[in-house]
Structures are given as C-alpha cells and as structure tokens.
UniProtKB/Swiss-Prot annotation:
Pathway: Metabolic intermediate biosynthesis; chorismate biosynthesis; chorismate from D-erythrose 4-phosphate and phosphoenolpyruvate: step 7/7. The keyword Flavoprotein applies. Homotetramer. It catalyses: 5-O-(1-carboxyvinyl)-3-phosphoshikimate = chorismate + phosphate. GO terms for cellular component: cytosol. One of its GO terms (biological process) is chorismate biosynthetic process. The gene is aroC. This is Chorismate synthase.
Length: 358
C-alpha cells in the first residue's frame, strides 16, 4: 500500500490502524540539533485527542506519545524520529454486527473494491485516528518553523450556517469549539448538542494561517506551494474543499479589485498593501500571511437508520452506534495546523537547494 509518506526533504510516514495495538509516525529529514520537547508534542496531541469535551467522540484515549528514536538530550540527532502512541480504549466489538455492511459516507466500499480485503474495525487505516501521526510529526515541523520565525494558527470559522463574526485569537483555546468568537462559539455548542440528540452530525469550515513565511517558498508548475498545501489538506479525512485568499470569491471580483499593489516598506522589504492572493503568487510564497480555509463534511457515522447494501450487494439497513464525533471541527484545528507545518517545513528545506548564494 503506497501513499503513506508525505514530503520530499522533510518527510513524514504514518502507520497504524484505529483499533490496532498502536499508531505512530516516522519523521525523516529533520536537521540535527533541533530542540524537540516531548512535552510540546504531547501538548499538540492533547489538542487533537478524543474525549476532550462534549462535542467530541466519547472514546477515552490518553494518546501518550513515546519518542523511540532520533532524539537525544532533547535535540534531534538527524536520524529518523520514530514516535508511538498505544491505543488503550479500542472497542472493535462495536463493529462486529456491521462488518459485512457498507457504511454510507465511509470508505468501506472503496477499500473493498481496491484491495478485496479490509480492516472493518472502525475503518482501520482510513480512520481519522491515523492523524495522530500527522499531529506528532507536525509538532516537529512547527519547532523547525519557529526557529525561522514562522507561526501557524487555525480556528473554527463556521459550523453549518453559524459563522464567526469576531476574530479574537485569544479566545480560540478558551472554548471547546476552538472558535475565535465567544458568542458564536456558545451557539455552535448548542447546535452540536442538538445534532447529537437528533442522531445527526454537522460540517463546517476551519481557517488556517501561517505568519512569518519568507518569500520564495514553493516550486513552479507541479510543486506549487498551494498545490502541495492543497494535497496536504485534502489528504485529511472528511475534507471536501480548500480555498486560498479570496478563494471562490474571486469569481465575483474584477482584476482591478483582486490585484494586490506592491509597495516598498519602511524596513526596505517589498510587500503588498492587501492580501487577496492569500500569500502565494505563481505557486511561490510572497512573504505575506498565507491564508486558507478548508471545508469538512459532516461525520458519516450517525445512529440514524440508513439504507445500504452488504458485501454481496443485498439491500439492507444500518444503524451506526458507538463513540463518534458529531462534528470534526474542534479536533480538525490542530490537524490542519500540522499539515500546513509539514508542507512549509519541507519547502523551507527545499529552498536551500534552489539557488547558489554569493
């Protein structure tokens, strides 16, 4: 099964299944000497963890990370960094009675078609539990970026038709929706609880931003920066849309409005007076803030009676019980940050190979 490794110079490989013994990752290409704190990686994993609030899955996992290699005395050695998290609350029995049925909205059917065999325990490798490795690897990428003055932040921008109207970044980690608008966050919680009572789920939008990104990151044509970021975001389970800058709003704009005028700033650098382009032009970073939004579908696991078929194609009905997220948005925030960090760390290291300095 290919497709488990992401990146060219700074590379992440994830492994493990939802209800297997453990999940984890290997980070390769991390420069030696980088400060790596297990506590910081754990902090990032805690933000992604299930069971952290009443708007997430009730599965109880501590997600305690163990660094197995590549770090000595708190610093990267340059060797592959291997990290492991044991699954301690897996309950595959919840899926025993539906193992031969195709869950609507899930990858059961497509995996069967492709491989002829699948792990039916909570989706196996296709489960969002795989993203533990992404967040752990992304934490290492964040440390690398921080040393170069780059920071990444994300938040829940929209749940259903509820949109954040105020952007107070200090509010994001103060509420369980990770929404920067406290008033709207409270409404979102009510909406999620209502959906759970109705045996349903909700989708929404997460906004992601990167600041301090130097100009010049990204490769022309097929490895454009936004192309790699788009691939990273679309690889996250449940993501159905990605837009940069003004996104699909450009369809309603004119060139004279959308174009961002260049200017020379007081410190001598060149920048733009606006940022409709979202920090990337021609597939290469401009030095402005990188701005993108990702749309997540409603989680497919709902306890309502739904029509489906079994592996033989016989019509039947299915109810999916167990411990499932009524919305992915709060836990999507750290995952999206991690994936953007992985792309930027990779392109930062690749940029060192792009030109000879005089």
């Amino acid at each position: 099964m290919p497709g488990n490794t992401f990146g060219q110079v700074f590379r992440l490989t994830t492994w493990g299944e939802s209800h297997g013994p453990a999940v984890g990752c290997v980070v390769d290409g991390c420069p030696a000497g980088l400060d790596i704190s297990e506590d910081y990686i754990q902090h990032e994993l805690n933000r992604r963890r299930v069971g952290q609030s009443r708007v997430t899955s009730a599965r109880q996992e501590s997600d305690q990370v163990q660094i197995l290699s590549g770090v000595f005395e708190g610093r990267a050695t340059g060797a592959p960094i291997s990290m492991l998290v044991f699954n301690t609350d897996a309950k595959p029995g919840h899926y025993e009675n539906i193992k031969d049925l195709y869950r609507p909205g899930h990858a059961d059917y497509t995996w069967d078609v492709k491989y002829g065999f699948r792990d039916w325990r909570g989706g196996g490798r296709s489960s969002a539990r795989e993203t533990i490795g992404r967040v752990a690897g992304g934490a290492v990428a964040k440390r690398l970026l921080a040393q170069h003055g780059v920071s990444i932040i994300a938040w829940t921008a929209q749940l259903g038709d509820l949109k954040a109207e105020v952007i107070d970044e200090s509010e994001i980690e103060r509420n369980i929706m990770r929404c920067p608008d406290a008033r709207v966050a409270a409404l979102m919680v009510e909406r999620v609880e209502q959906a759970r009572r109705s045996l349903d789920s909700l989708g929404g939008i997460v906004e992601v931003r990167a600041r301090g990104v130097p100009p010049g990151l990204g490769e022309p044509v097929f490895d454009k920066l936004q192309a790699d970021i788009g691939k990273a975001m679309f690889s996250i389970p449940a993501i159905k849309g990605v837009e940069f800058g003004e996104g699909f709003g450009v369809a309603h704009m004119t060139g004279s409005v959308h174009n961002d005028p260049f200017e020379r700033r007081a410190d001598g650098t060149i920048g733009t007076s606006s940022n409709h382009h979202g920090g990337i032009l021609g597939g290469i970073s401009t030095g402005e803030e990188i701005v993108l939004r990702i749309a997540a579908k409603p989680p497919a696991s709902i306890a309502r009676l739904q029509r489906t078929v079994d592996r033989e194609g016989n019509p039947t009905e299915i109810e999916i019980h167990g411990r499932h997220d009524p919305t992915v948005l709060p836990r999507l925030v750290p995952i999206a940050e991690a994936m953007l960090a992985l792309v930027l760390a990779d392109h930062l290291l690749r940029q060192r190979l792009a030109r000879m300095e005089r």
